[in-house]
């Protein structure tokens, strides 16, 4: 059987088209495979780069771990630009070289440095040492008490503002008049009259740093510890300048010096002498203000009371009737009162200080809660005053020296 020539030609053409289609399909598959391999290669390259980076980081960490520790030392003297005398932490003194990475201007007597173990060369200068106890005395969060929250102490608030707040906020006023701003104020008076409250209000009203110290914290067991802590507190205050240092219960460390031979008294006297030197010594105190509080001014050492250390001594006395009324208004502002005459309460609450009046308000509220009432009436305040007065008389003890002091 024979086929036409045209039919044979079509078969040959179809075979060629099929072959060409297969070749194109193979090429497309190969190109797709190449593309996948290229993408995979890029992913592997990125992973390789990431692994190399991690490897470098781990190598650097290992190198740091392999570096031997450095020896701590203190500069005693600088001989020239590249040599210094150092007292090492191991004991002996050495004449050592300075590393090229160390600035010679940083090498001053007393500076802390790091020494290489083998050559003892100075390789790093450390920042000044700070006592963690002094650092902990700085108040980061300001108290939420303002002068408006203090009643019956208008004259005292004015005096403390003039001494502490005004020099920090408007120093140009003192420059125009030509006087040096006061440096410190001593608050004294019976317990509960608001001495610590005034210091909290000063911390709230000013933007200065605030360092709070209790006098007993400066009294330490071992020789020199208390004096060192005093130095560190004032050093911290100068670094944080403008700053206010509040020393509560200062009589714990600033009592009159005697001829006592006990070791504890001698250490307290050393701490006091360091405090006197820091308050008004050879070095300027800078923009650092001091507020101190005590309820025993009669036992304070005369040296600490002189001007230059405490330029103003403010008595926080017992509030009068108007003062007690102001205090009661502050403490009863959010209380649900019904038929209460605060003037009458202030009149019958004689010889009570601010802390007593706050306790009276709390007790009056407790009486209302006990009787399942949602408001406080006048009888609650009368019962509260009777309770607080009776508690004070029961816990009182004779202190004849205070009678003269507070009148």
From Swiss-Prot:
- Kindly state a single biological-process term from the GO annotations of this entry: protein unfolding
Q: Where in the cell is it found?
A: Cytoplasm
Q: Which residues form a coiled coil?
A: 22-67
A single Gene Ontology MF term assigned here is: ATP binding
A Pfam family the protein falls into: AAA_lid_3
Xref: SUPFAM superfamilies: P-loop containing nucleoside triphosphate hydrolases
**Source species, domain of life:** Archaea
Say if the entry is tagged with keyword Flavoprotein: no
Q: Which PROSITE patterns match?
A: AAA (PS00674)
Record-level GO cellular component terms: cytoplasm; proteasome-activating nucleotidase complex
- Detail which positions bind ATP: 192-197, 331
Chief location bin? cytoplasm
Provide this UniProt record's keywords sorted from A to Z.
Answer: ATP-binding, Chaperone, Coiled coil, Cytoplasm, Nucleotide-binding, Proteasome
What residue spans carry the region label Docks into pockets in the proteasome alpha-ring to cause gate opening? 405-407
The free-text domain note is:
Consists of three main regions, an N-terminal coiled-coil domain that may assist in substrate recognition, an interdomain involved in PAN hexamerization, and a C-terminal ATPase domain of the AAA type.
What family does the database annotate?
Belongs to the AAA ATPase family.
Q: PANTHER family from the entry?
A: 26S PROTEASOME REGULATORY SUBUNIT (PTHR23073)
Assembly, in brief, is:
Homohexamer. The hexameric complex has a two-ring architecture resembling a top hat that caps the 20S proteasome core at one or both ends. Upon ATP-binding, the C-terminus of PAN interacts with the alpha-rings of the proteasome core by binding to the intersubunit pockets.
- Its biological function? ATPase which is responsible for recognizing, binding, unfolding and translocation of substrate proteins into the archaeal 20S proteasome core particle. Is essential for opening the gate of the 20S proteasome via an interaction with its C-terminus, thereby allowing substrate entry and access to the site of proteolysis. Thus, the C-termini of the proteasomal ATPase function like a 'key in a lock' to induce gate opening and therefore regulate proteolysis.
Stated name of the protein: Proteasome-activating nucleotidase
Q: What organism is recorded for this protein? A: Methanococcus maripaludis (strain C5 / ATCC BAA-1333)
Gene that encodes it:
pan
